[in-house]
Amino acid sequence: YEVSYADGREPPFPMVMKVPLMREGDGSENIVSFEVEQQLLQVLHGAHVPRFVAAGDLHRVPYLVMEHVHGITLDAWMQSFAQAREPIPLEAIVRLGAGLAQAVHSLHQQNVCHLDLKPANVMVAAIGVDGERIVLLDFGLSCHSDYPDLLAEEFRKAVGSPTWIAPEQVVGMRGDLRSDIFAIGVILYEMATGETPFGSPTTTGGLRQRLWVSPKPPRAWRADVPEWLQEVILRCLEPQASQRYPSAAHLMFDLRNPGQVMVTERGKRITGKGFWWHFKRWVRAAGMQYEPSPLPSQQIAEVPIVMVAVPNYDVSDVAMYALRQATARSLGTRPGAQLAVVTVVNTGLFGGSEHKDKSETWLQRQHLAGFRKWADGLDLSGHQVSYHVIESNDVAQALLRYAEGNNVNLIIMGAATHGLSMQRFVATVPIKVAMHAPCTVVLVKEQMPFQQLAETEAEAEALMPQPDQEMMESLPQSFPP
């Protein structure tokens, strides 16, 4: 129901009222789900959830008034392509998928798992080249780590929509943020192929098949699906939560940086797996134990995205060494962290006269080759690494935009060592980034390796004037106390 103020005041935004469906014969899950949504909407915030307005007493007149988000549901948008018998453009799939991952990540940062993600619960407020505002709806099956899980206490069974429910939810496990990543994978699969990976099962046995069944590869349905996109989708659909993306931010990162996705056997499949492969997987699934992450926000912090800002000019080997050492320390204390190595070049660099005989691709390759050489000294086992060259005339703003757009958790960059006397009046790039970054920033001072320090001291001693031998002999051999 649309809502307005009784006294005629103009509302700050369109409002809508939601009331629980309580017909004769309906189960108690309707009112329990309504109570969960009423509880969560009052504590959730951000652009990806409807704004809460008011709520009625559950024991008298239960209702919920919230922002009326204008737009189209993802389900209706997908149906428009199905009715026209046209495939959804891959660019739109990737863009909407990244926007959905961003919205889900915002939810996880507030310690909430949606647990009922499906196209009907995703509102696309705007569609265009500049991006979309994705708003998540219907939090009746959601779980907040700081509140009692009313659904888990009330029902001892799988709770969720059969088509999109994650394997761990099938066995009654709630509260793992990677369950939402599985649901995003189902949505991406459906957008790319027009089919659902596991059908729409109605029995417990049908639901449990996703614990071991590998879906038909998207490229078997649609030949123009690139390998990297299939890799992303099938990683989301892994039955073991530990083999999926550790957070929605990591999923969004890959969708926005397709050139950095490491394609494995998953991405190259064009046929489904055979009987014996599924039989072995079924045997493993029989004894599978699911261990959810303790808190969604803690899971995000434990497997962060680390960004290293590497200068591309006016930098010494000592500074690069110090930057590499700081990166090694950060990765050493963060197993599984994703590393993004970033540099910013001037807008006119690729078109300047000094590079007129070089292509932009060649110059990009030169920078990327330098990055990989710099990273040779790092232990990158267990870490996904990507390299990025950003073109901009404002280095600080480019780094900040990258960090915000990719949900970076930690920025490592060199501290300015020249012009120190002027830093009180003019903010340097590191200071600007540290002041406005959406995450922690580590500024690294120059430091030399111990071996080079020893060599430097030896050189200094060699250059020092040596005392005259006769003068030394004339000095007393001992001094009075």
Q: What kind of feature is each model-predicted range?
A:
Residues 413-436, 450-452:
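Glycine-rich, Arg-bearing micro-motifs that act as flexible, cationic patches
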